[in-house]
Amino acid sequence: MNWEVEVIRKKEDLIRDTQEFLRINSVMDETTAGPGKPFGEGVNASLTSLLELGEKEGFTTKNLDGFAGHIEWGEGDDIIGVLCHVDVVPPGDGWTSDPFSAEIRNGRIYARGAIDDKGPTMAAFYALKIVKDMNLPLSKRVRMIIGTDEESDWRCVEHYFKHEEMPTMGFAPDADFPIINAEKGIIDASLLIPHRPNQAEPKAVLVSFQSGLRLNMVPDAAEAVIEGPKNEEILSSFKDMLRTTDQKGEAAIENGQLILRMYGLSCHAMEPNNGINAGILLCEFLQQTELDDAGKRFVQVVTDKFSGDTRGKKLDIDCEDEISGELTLNVGTLRYKEGQGGELGINIRYPVTAESKVIRDTFESASEFELGEFKDSKPHHVSADHPLVKTLQKVYEGQLGKKADLISIGGGTYARSLKAGVAFGPLFPGRPDSAHQKDEYIEIDDLLRSTALYAQAIYELAK
């Protein structure tokens, strides 16, 4: 069978449906949540549109209270899972085109969710459609499981697997090719910096500080509001810093308050070194000013414990292993309010052989901050000799003529929600990863190639 030819036959429909899918703003918005739409109207619209497309094509579909859904084809006791998600991270600013216009330029579709994960989700859907339309005999059911809260708390899969059976094995089209069989553990933690009263009359009061939208994104913007007789002096110093460095920002005095804004570069938290943390940058500047005691303490904790360190060395939690590499640490959100104290939202990706308890114990014994929330998603590893891995290697090597090496990532995919699950694409080796960045895109050629790989993978696993 020539899987590439089958995909080319559906090329125009695949591109059209992918664009229409991407035009739905599916950023979680709990202000519009309600019965049957727990994560807001946009996420729900994206889920229902895909389920309706599945129903139209003759698949069995199911919506589980708006938390998740599935699209199924085939018969048998065993289930092959294809785990996708329709929610996306906030687009942020600085896009060349509207992040939800799904504009095509230079052979690419640009949109939030193009590569993470709505583009690959549509590729998987068309792969299943190809298997169905070719009337290929299957001995197992193939089930696309569609999540809606992957970018936040995974409440979708938690709800789904309370009500539905676990697939025998499966893959998530939500990372890199060839095959990812190891995923680091993921910790989301909040570190609280309690307010302490000033010992003397301050010359500059940190009124507020805010940076970051999600723990799994490096913050690309930060804002500090300052009051006091030192405003003009701090403003001048800030402008000098911008003039003499390559850092980007802006500042102004409005209604007696000094507002400082710093800009960085967002990226996925799995490798914070690919971005520039605007929150930490702004704290580094503020460290040089004469802030009030409480504000100074907040800034000091950030700079002492996180400046220039994405590996947790300053916190004494750094570690690594041969399977999955180094621990990474991202300060995804930074918040401070005068009289209330501060809070840092931390995202940690730790090696598959490491113990999260060691990290928790370190945080709980720290004197600089208090540990608030601590969420831990355990590491995931599937053996290299597992039939799932062997089958996907055969598919990849057969279609592309390249060795299907096994790799590990710091990102967390739905594959870890399965007992036997791996991530399989959509990002091909050598391609830049635009996920969670402005001007996110998917190469149309890669959309087609991944669809062909998914179609054969589905058939080989379920035949």
Curated annotation (Swiss-Prot):
Cofactor descriptive note: Binds 2 Zn(2+) ions per subunit.
Stored SUPFAM superfamilies: Bacterial exopeptidase dimerisation domain (SSF55031), Zn-dependent exopeptidases (SSF53187)
Sites where the protein binds Zn(2+) 2: H85, D116, D174
Keyword Hydrolase: yes
The protein's required cofactors: Zn(2+)
Disruption phenotype: Non-essential, it can be disrupted.
Top EC group: hydrolase
Record: active site: D87, E150 (proton acceptor)
EC number(s) given by UniProt: 3.4.13.-
Residues reported to bind Zn(2+) 1: D116, E151, H436
GO biological process, one term: proteolysis
PROSITE patterns (alphabetical): ARGE_DAPE_CPG2_2
Molecular-function GO terms, alphabetical: acetylornithine deacetylase activity; dipeptidase activity; metallopeptidase activity; zinc ion binding
Nucleotidyltransferase listed as a keyword: no
Keywords assigned by UniProt, alphabetized: Dipeptidase, Hydrolase, Metal-binding, Metalloprotease, Protease, Zinc
Domain of life per record: Bacteria
Family: Belongs to the peptidase M20A family.
Protein name: Putative dipeptidase YtjP
Organism encoding this protein: Bacillus subtilis (strain 168)
Lineage, highest ranks first: Bacteria, Bacillati, Bacillota, Bacilli, Bacillales
